Amino acid sequence: MADPPHFSLFQQKFRTGDKPFLTLDADFLMNHTKVLLKSDASDKVWKVKLDGGRLSEGWEEFACDQKFRDGDVLVFKHHGDEVFHVAVVSPSVSGDIRNASSSQVITEDTYIDVDDVDDDDYGQDDEDDDDDDDEGEDNIENISEKTDKRQEADSSSDHSGFITARVTRYSLLHDRLDLSRNFTLLFGGHQKTCEIDVVDEQGRRWTMKLAKNISSGVFYIRLGWGNFCCANGLTQGDLCKFKLFQNEERPVLWLCPQESGNGRKEKRTFDEVSKGKEKKTPSPFLIVKYTPSRETTGQLSLPVSFTRNNSINKTGEVILLNQDGRKWSSYLQITGLGRGAGSEWFYLRRGWREMCEANGVGVNDSFKLELVWEGANPMFKFCSKIENHEYKGKGNQRTRKKRACETAPQPRNVKKTPRLGVEGPVYQVDEERGHTQVSNRTNTISGNLQRLLPPSCSVSDQVANVKQGIVDSLNTVRQCRTELETSEQNLQASLLAIDALGERIWGISKILSSNLV
């Protein structure tokens, strides 16, 4: 296990919902995926996952157990290996820590290498009043500003800090990322080109070239930036935050984890969830009916939705087979091309009647097929014959409803005028006089009319019947159109045959004429 980092104490201001980011060096982050947190409140040791320096899973439970409040200043003291002691400090102790020597301040997170501060000093409860808390918060802001200025002025080899960079279209096209001015302040006045390691959140390293633009004085990295973006899902417009380390053989830029609410993180999570969802697989089964018209034309049409959902989009030879493995050759033909979207449909041109005959399927019988793919070629497997009684009940019920609506008595020359009765507007119909007659027996006649009309003749049933009639008419038109196309093809073939026969007759007559001469 790697040696613990050289720092031992630093502090953070607690905010509900936030997860503290601990500025740990690269070696520690590469060799540790968790930390162990202790406090004076109990002897329990809390295991908290470490996500690139940020405390993640387990931190909220620890904070809830410790009853931290917004604005509390938390001090993390490193006890070696993975153990950190966490305590809430009072404003006075916080000021002492913050007023430490500038040479001991290392990064944005205020921490110093202090071993002479006892746990009891910063483990005491905060008993000061609100005025002291406000004064302590002002001191924190003032010291933070001073710390930032010291960081910019400090260019020593052990200096570490944060820089931000945005992924642009130019950087992706030219495999180059221009670093911010802050990097120049942190890195110093190095003029020569050198190598730099860029490390992602998972600890993977990319060695790139670090160079400086002489005219602008801005540093940039190249030769590997595009691969880094591709491996980490970085796209144009993403904002990246790096931490700079200079205590190794070459400088290191460590990609910091994205904070909650970042667009790139949310986008990646959404993409992963979307990819994880299983796609709905279309059904390969099809139920068709052996109708007299199909017997006549020899064409078994397939539903458009079935062919579209199963990606059947080209014509060609297909194989029909049954449960015994017997095969029939068929051809999948398309018709209706050039007539607009939804006008094309496929049909089987031959072989299917022989298959039905071999499997006991006759005219007006239904049967079930299964689509099986053999590479890129579809095959249709005969599954079973479906007895007519399976659909007879539902079909007869619909027919009975339709007939009841058609045969229901309809009033002649009816004019209606509303009359407010006990239960609302009601009507009485006088068929002989052709107009509405007011009566005191409105409720009785209304009840008689309701008994005369069958319950199936509601508006919704009539709409359904009309819709079904339109669908049936459309199917009939399509079938007739298919039959006309087939007849046209047959007539054209007959014309070609007649032309060929005429040529043969003309040739024979020519031979006979030459012989007679």
Curated annotation (Swiss-Prot):
Bias (Basic and acidic residues): 143-157
Pfam families: B3
Gene Ontology BP term (one): megagametogenesis
Tissue specificity comment: Expressed in the shoot apical meristem (SAM), in the inflorescence apex and flowers.
A GO MF label: DNA binding
Localization, UniProt: Nucleus
DNA-binding region per Swiss-Prot/TrEMBL record: 7-92, 162-259, 285-385
Region span, Disordered: 115-158, 393-415
Annotated keywords: DNA-binding, Nucleus, Repeat, Transcription, Transcription regulation
Chain intervals with Acidic residues compositional bias: 115-140
PROSITE patterns in UniProt: B3
Cellular component per GO, a single term: nucleus
Main location: nucleus
Protein's job: May play a role in flower development.
Protein name: B3 domain-containing protein REM1
Lineage, broadest ranks: Eukaryota, Viridiplantae, Streptophyta, Embryophyta, Tracheophyta
Gene for this chain: REM1
